[in-house]
Amino acid sequence: EKLNDGFARDLLELETCIAHIADAPETPALQPEALQTLNAESVMESQYLPRAALRIMRFAHNIHAYYDAVVHQKSQPRCEATPLWLAVFRDDDAVWRLPLSRGEARLLIALQKEKTLSQAIDLAHTDMLAENEDVAALLHHYLQRWMQHRLLSHTHLPQAQSLERNMQCA
């Protein structure tokens, strides 16, 4: 089947992204133990910083299925326009692709912009609600998935909130 221009452009963007991710600096993955020390308020007011070798991309075509078929020498799917959000990341010197929902992608993009989890949820709330009315359960699912795929680098409480909390304890 002849590739259309939009599909070819998406495929080129993915290939370029994979090359950049392969060269991006490696940052250590967040370990689950780091989350165990946070209380409920700290969880929401912390920043969860994604790893440096992570890009969130939006495509007009499902190039992930096509790329996967080519890599694994399967029959190639039709190159129809199907919107796709995709995380492209490196872990242990291997480049990976992970399809995302729109809400999950919007949340990760907000975290890349150093928003707190609470701020990121505010930005992605409408998209998350479209997926599941139980935003808390959806958030739990996202965090589990991100930890499983090692997408996050570290977490920290923004300085102003940390200082305020220390003053309240004094």
Go through the PLM ranges and name each one:
Residues 37-46, 71-76:
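Intrinsically disordered, low-complexity boundary segments flanking structured domains
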Residues 1-39, 93, 98-170:
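Long, charge-rich, low-complexity alpha-helical segments
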Residues 48, 66-67, 142, 149:
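Sequence-level detector for tyrosine residue identity
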Residues 50-113:
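Low-complexity, glycine/alanine/valine/leucine- and proline-rich hydrophobic stretches
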Residues 10-11, 44-49, 77-79, 144:
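A general structural signal for short secondary-structure junctions and capping/turn motifs
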